[in-house]
Amino acid sequence: MTTTDTAPQTQPFQAEVAELLNLMVHSVYSETEIFLRELISNGSDALDKLRYEAISKPDLMEAGGTPKIQIVPKKAPDTLSVIDNGIGMDRQELIDNLGTIAKSGTKSFLTKLTEAKDGSNLIGQFGVGFYAAFMVADRIVVTSRRAGSTEAWTWTSSGGAGFEIAPASAEEAERIVRGTEIVLHLKPEAAKYLEAYQIERIVSAYSDNIQFPIELVPEEGEARQINSASALWQRSKSELAAEDYKQAYKSIANAFDDPAMTLHYRAEGRYSYAVMLFAPSTKPFDLFEPQRKGHVKLYVRRVFITDDADLLPAYLRFIRGVIDSEDLPLNLSREMLQNNPQLVQIRKAVTGKVIGELESLGEKDPENFAKIWDAFGPVIKEGIWEDYERREKLLALSRFTTTKGDNRTLKNYVEDLRDNQTEIYYLVGDSLERLKSNPKLESAAARGIEVLLLTDPVDAFWTSAPLDFGGKPLKSLSQGDVNFDLIPTTDEAKDEQPKPETDEALVIATIKDALGERVSDVRASQRLTASASCLIAGGQGPDRALERMLAQQNRGGASKPILEINLRHPLVAAIGRPGNADAADLSLLLLEQAQILDGELPEDPAGFAGRINRLVLRAL
């Protein structure tokens, strides 16, 4: 150890940590008690890591006693200590773990935390729960010794701009054989957390199912265990009540909401494993992070191995819980887990069970299923694109807003097909209101044809796959040809007005001449009944919605669209009048108004305004 290492040093916090600490120190959150849940959770993680490392290094467990967490309240001065004899931290780990946040999405998290009325759930979700202790403490001292090390270190902070790190005193180093001691110097208003009944209440509410004993160590008397320390997933369903599952979910998932779905079973046969999984009822803030990380923990015979083993496909990353295998070797590395044949089979089987449970919930408990779909529907639909094997099931599971209503299934859609209708029609956009008024719906509406209205960003991707449901292919109303000739219009939509005398070839030639290279083609529309024009994509390649999205992400430019025109519209008919001096302006306006109706801006806003002004002035 160098002289520099042994001398106390003051170091600044990473900018994001300083911002987070400022939020904690000046917290207005009502649930300040969650600090204890977070510290206990961190202690449990440290004990899990110790058990895992001890598989290959058994000597790590020789000193330090039975794995446990202790809570020690002391008055005068008011301090609350949370102690674990887990893996511990060395000097650099203290700096890295308590002085920085090495995670993507930090800025997004801090923004949401600043805006939240109660950020307690967000704090747990993001894994920065240690800093929640500054909601109740004006000074925190952390002393830690890594398992197998002879050195102990002390980290101290008052929640300001930085922290001090120094070697632990001889007395502290002797006291902490292995693990971490966190001493909170409580603010006056937080003194209630020194009361035994408060500590027991919080542990019962949030941490009862932590696998390790949690002991309350009073100033007088003996330490006593205050949690059940039971791996509930290893017990049979008949032994557990609904409240047990709620508490297990909150403990395993570090959550505050109640689960909208619970799946608990034991698989026996070629492989034996216990499963306890939950679907949350609220959406976590990091659902759409690029890493799409899962949240299912892998245990082997109750020993935590990893929470990063891709135990479910990415489109089920909202599922929380535990899979505990009886057969996997304890010393299997995290890297080897990815290709382990047992785990591949477990993943396949559990994925099928989760989808089956979602199907069952949709039929038996639509209200709870609606909570899941509202929060996680866009994520589940990623699987339609990614999981060919389960595509049909995921399509059947999906709920849609359509021109007939909300929460419609494709089964509902197929049951209500119009006579001679052979396709399932959809329209993709970024706004439900804009889609409802989209001119591409007009001919379908006149025939009573239901159309799926898709507004989630993922919809532009999964609909680009070749899809069918019940033998009926899915067809975009903004791409390729549409033929409704064999589907009669409804009585209400019948229009007895004669078609204007329009020279179709002349009109199309005039518009093409005016638009030049702006479009790939101009043609008469079967989609339109009232509007003058619309833009569509060709039959090959991506839908217009996907083209726009890819262009916004600089992942390719949009191809030239096709302009469809309604030959029955007076504006279109006017273009075909011989000698019409406004034909070029009208042709450009047909394109520009179609762009606006699709949510795009005209390429030349000044030119667009000039054309409008000229035509209005001529009409005065």
UniProtKB/Swiss-Prot annotation:
Query: What is this protein's name?
Result: Chaperone protein HtpG
* Protein's organism: Rhodopseudomonas palustris (strain BisA53)
The record's section on SUPFAM superfamilies has: ATPase domain of HSP90 chaperone/DNA topoisomerase II/histidine kinase (SSF55874), HSP90 C-terminal domain (SSF110942), Ribosomal protein S5 domain 2-like (SSF54211)
Q: Where is the protein found, in the record's own terms?
A: Cytoplasm
Q: Which UniProt keywords apply?
A: ATP-binding, Chaperone, Cytoplasm, Nucleotide-binding, Stress response
What GO molecular function annotations does the UniProt record carry, in alphabetical order? ATP binding; ATP hydrolysis activity; ATP-dependent protein folding chaperone; unfolded protein binding
Q: Where is this region: A?
A: 1-334
Query: What ranges does the record give for the region C, renumbered to this chain?
Result: 549-620
Q: Which domain of life is it from?
A: Bacteria
